[in-house]
């Protein structure tokens, strides 16, 4: 954001809890956003996913690929519409390995307006996170990253 001359608060981080989202995941997201001084919001997608599963006849007790992919696709819908509403763009988190090997949900987490990690193999992601943790501005940010 510095290179764009924009405040970090112009970044809107979105957490979208649903089935299986833990308190730790939510807490780490909040801490990360606070430490980086980016805006943070929550969109609880559980009701939307329940409605979607009802529409398609998906039994929520069947933890299959439809159960997993349905959540990813709802998240992408929410992100794309939030980006449209706010004049932003969706920055994807998928890496080169996930994209090359198909370890992403079509019309789900493989879609974004900018795939910042699209050229980064999974084997390098851990090293990049470690590097950022090593230069982190605070001990709390370092803790969350590691």
Predicted regions and their residues:
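A conserved beta-strand->alpha-helix junction
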Residues: 4-66, 72, 98, 144-146
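Nucleotide-activated chemistry modules centered on ATP-dependent adenylation/adenylyltransferase
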Residues: 50-62, 69-146
């Amino acid at each position: 954001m510095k290179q764009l001359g924009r405040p970090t608060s112009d970044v809107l981080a979105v957490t979208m809890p649903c089935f299986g989202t833990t308190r730790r995941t939510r807490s780490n997201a909040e801490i990360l956003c606070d430490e980086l001084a980016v805006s943070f919001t929550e969109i609880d997608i559980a009701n939307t996913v329940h409605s979607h599963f009802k529409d398609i006849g998906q039994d929520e007790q069947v933890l299959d690929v439809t159960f997993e992919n349905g959540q990813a696709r709802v998240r992408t819908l929410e992100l794309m519409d939030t980006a449209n509403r706010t004049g932003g763009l969706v920055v994807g988190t998928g890496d080169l390995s996930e994209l090359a090997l198909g370890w992403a949900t079509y019309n789900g987490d493989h879609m974004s307006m900018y795939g910042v990690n699209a050229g980064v193999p999974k084997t390098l992601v851990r090293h990049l996170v470690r590097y950022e943790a090593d230069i982190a501005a605070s001990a709390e940010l370092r803790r969350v990253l590691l």
